[in-house]
């Protein structure tokens, strides 16, 4: 079999429905829109939340909560993820970004969490550390510095 022998499966390619091309086509005159009314007009139809004049569900439900602008949002990195670095290397948010451990530096920066084990001495510079993460970094012979 060669590339020029390849054909799509039967009925795999559906033809586009061309409407409004004469009554003989079967899709002429009203073009499948029915006769008159809001939905027959161009730009017609109702918005997704419209329920025919009945009070919509989103207005019946109470407002709840708020977004705290002072909330601290960190990128969370576990201790075991730092094993990707070489012994004695300095770990910064920029280097975590380079290695693909984080996607982007969050609003409040990077926080190191204590899940897993660290088997290398590293100098870790981050915006926050959990108590267990700091202990594990120092137990491996490294340093945990808050930036």
Swiss-Prot record:
* Record's compositionally biased regions (Gly residues): 21-35
| Keyword rRNA-binding among UniProt keywords | yes
Membrane-crossing ranges are none
Gene Ontology biological process terms in this record: translation
Cellular-component GO terms for this entry: cytosolic large ribosomal subunit
UniProt-listed InterPro entries: Ribosomal_uL15, Ribosomal_uL15/eL18, Ribosomal_uL15/eL18_sf, Ribosomal_uL15_bac-type, Ribosomal_uL15_CS
Q: Where is this region: Disordered?
A: 1-57
Keywords noted in UniProt: Ribonucleoprotein, Ribosomal protein, RNA-binding, rRNA-binding
The reply on keyword rRNA-binding is: yes
Subunit info here reads: Part of the 50S ribosomal subunit.
- Protein's recorded name: Large ribosomal subunit protein uL15
Q: Which organism is it from?
A: Halothermothrix orenii (strain H 168 / OCM 544 / DSM 9562)
